[in-house]
Regions:
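Short glycine-rich, acidic/polar surface loops and turns
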Residues: 89-91, 128-136
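Outer-membrane beta-barrel "beta-signal"
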Residues: 135-142, 160-171
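Outer-membrane beta-barrel transmembrane domain signature
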Residues: 110-130
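Conserved active-site loop/cleft motifs that coordinate metal ions or position small ligands
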Residues: 105-107, 143-149
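A short, acidic, flexible beta-alpha connecting loop/helix-capping segment that sits on the rim
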Residues: 150-154
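Short beta-alpha connecting loops at secondary-structure transitions
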Residues: 128, 147-149, 159-163
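C-terminal outer-membrane beta-barrel translocator/porin domains of Gram-negative envelope proteins
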Residues: 6-9, 13-102, 106-110, 114-116, ...
Length: 171
């Protein structure tokens, strides 16, 4: 939890809670369960500025374009004051017999974004979810990730992203 003053006189409390557990069910198979909750609130009671609102990152909700789900005002996604995500991932290692650097990944993601303080009619608090399969490839230039995801629950205004390619890793 932190209080931050960012480029103005508005002081915002930004609270985070992250939980992650790893489990090896058999040799080289690692399954991960992750839960994240984040909230932002103005200590002065003012509405949180658009630039300070929270969005769901694409790596936490595959199958949707990063920052393109949740409350909208006209054609603009406006984020929210609260975000929660749940991710379940399992790795199927060495599926290709002679290739040691490629793993197949199965995943299920769910997330929610809510809390529009200036207009509650814009607040769409439906849970979005997706399932998919990915390929993790450790190359000499670094890890490459290819993922294909299919949204299960969504809102009509959400923007889908079935395929995603990433270079590098997140911590």
């Amino acid at each position: 939890m932190s209080d931050r003053l960012v480029g103005s006189e508005m002081c915002i409390r930004d609270s985070n809670y992250d939980y992650k557990i790893f489990k090896e069910f058999y040799e080289n198979n690692v399954s991960t369960f992750a839960f994240s909750l984040r909230g932002a609130s103005s200590l002065s009671g003012d509405d949180i500025k658009l630039s300070e609102r929270l969005y769901i990152p694409g790596r936490k909700l595959r199958g949707f374009e990063s920052g393109k789900i949740g409350p909208k005002d006209g054609s603009d996604f406006i984020g929210g004051n609260y975000v929660s995500t749940i991710n379940a991932t399992t790795t199927i290692p060495k599926i290709l017999e002679n290739v040691q650097t490629v793993d197949i990944v199965l995943f299920a993601d769910a997330a929610n974004i809510w809390g529009v303080d200036y207009d509650s009619s814009l607040d769409k608090s439906g849970i979005r979810s997706s399932v998919g399969v990915g390929l993790d490839w450790l190359t000499p230039v670094g890890p490459l990730t290819f993922s294909f995801a299919q949204p299960i629950t969504k809102e009509p205004t959400d923007i889908e992203e079935t395929f995603r390619f990433n270079i590098g890793t997140s911590f």
